[in-house]
Amino acid sequence: MESLYELWGKRNPRWEEKYQDSVINVFADYGKGVNKYNEVKGKTFGAGYEVFILAFFIGLYSDQKKPLIEDASKVKQFGWAISNWGTQENRLGRTQYPRLREYVFAALVAKTDVDLIALDKGDVKPSKIVDQLMDSMEQYANFGFDFIKEKLEDDPNYFIKDTAFLRVFL
């Protein structure tokens, strides 16, 4: 039987497409693929899911969630399961970061109202628990995306400094 972590890792979180141009493409080379010939073009992150991770932590550390829009046609996925996040090496000296996935999962279990006793007793299916974890993850990230978007609208240079994202958490 697969663990909750393994089931969660097979998932691909959703995000609102309005953040693609306003946030994700500002900071990442989303949708371009990765190879050693890519130009960096001043992007802070490589893959779009890296911006998602940042947005998630902004929501988590702010203890704020924002539900995704109900219109499914305005919601997207990266097309890359969580278990694959941070597995690329050698892109501009990057190394893998599997522990970050573990920290995200642990935070979700800690902050999401899931009944692990009911799961252990077999009263609830693992997929239902994973659905709840994904919903929390998406809502935390959605708040974070909105936070980043608002900061950029107020001051397009807000995130230009090297410590800009760090300031968000301090």
List where the protein language model places each region.
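Charged, low-complexity intrinsically disordered terminal regions and linker tails
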Residues: 1-39, 65-170
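Short, basic amphipathic alpha-helical segments that act as recognition/interaction helices
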Residues: 35-70
